Amino acid sequence: CIRDRKYAFRKYKIKSVENNHTHLSPEELGKIESLELGGRFTKLEKTKDAFLFCCYAGLRYSDFTNLSPENIVKMHQETWLIYKSVKTNTEVRLPLYLLFEGKGIEVLNKYQDDLADFFKLRDNSNVNKELLIIAKLSGLNKRISFHTARHTNATLLIYSGVNITTVQ
């Protein structure tokens, strides 16, 4: 084929996949924040709170589920999240008290009696299914996943004037 200058794969087309990185606007995030989950949806509360915490902190699912109470550190009366990233194996230090008016700290305080349990979630696939229900109950017409939290964090930080190289 090469000698004859014929391209053996000329009939094949490479399919491109649309990049579906979704983020939430401040208004959409507010809808999830204000969602009251009662009755048969009470079991979704922890998933909602974990998602919101990751919106405020920018964590991946794998990093969140690998956290322990020891990763929440008080330094000079301020709350920090210090952990080693599962994907990159690098240490990350996040000043939770500076991010989004300390909303992440509020979530952690809600679970202060059993933070270890808060960091334990179902598998990512089931959590993502629960997030679809949460989005629908919030009135969002958007397919969100746990990774949406990370994109939401980055987008909101950039909107608020944080340098993109800092966000990366």
Model-derived regions: residue spans:
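Short, charged phosphate-coordinating catalytic segments
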Residues: R3-R5, E28, C54-Q77, T165
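Basic, Lys/Arg- and aromatic-enriched nucleic-acid-binding interface segment
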Residues: K6-Y61
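C-terminal catalytic core of Y-nucleophile DNA break-rejoin enzymes
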Residues: E18-N19, V86-I133
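Generic hydrophobic alpha-helical scaffold/packing signal
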Residues: E33, F51-C54, T65, L132-A135, ...
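Short, basic (Lys/Arg/His-rich) helix/loop patches that form interaction surfaces
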Residues: G38-F41, Q112-D117, L121, K129-T166
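Exposed loop/turn and edge beta-strand positions of beta-sandwich/beta-sheet ligand-binding modules
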Residues: T47, Q77, T90, L140, ...
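Short, cationic motifs built from Arg/Lys/His that form the positively charged side of catalytic pockets
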Residues: L59-R60, V92, R150
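Short aromatic-glycine-enriched beta-strand elements
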Residues: T79-L81
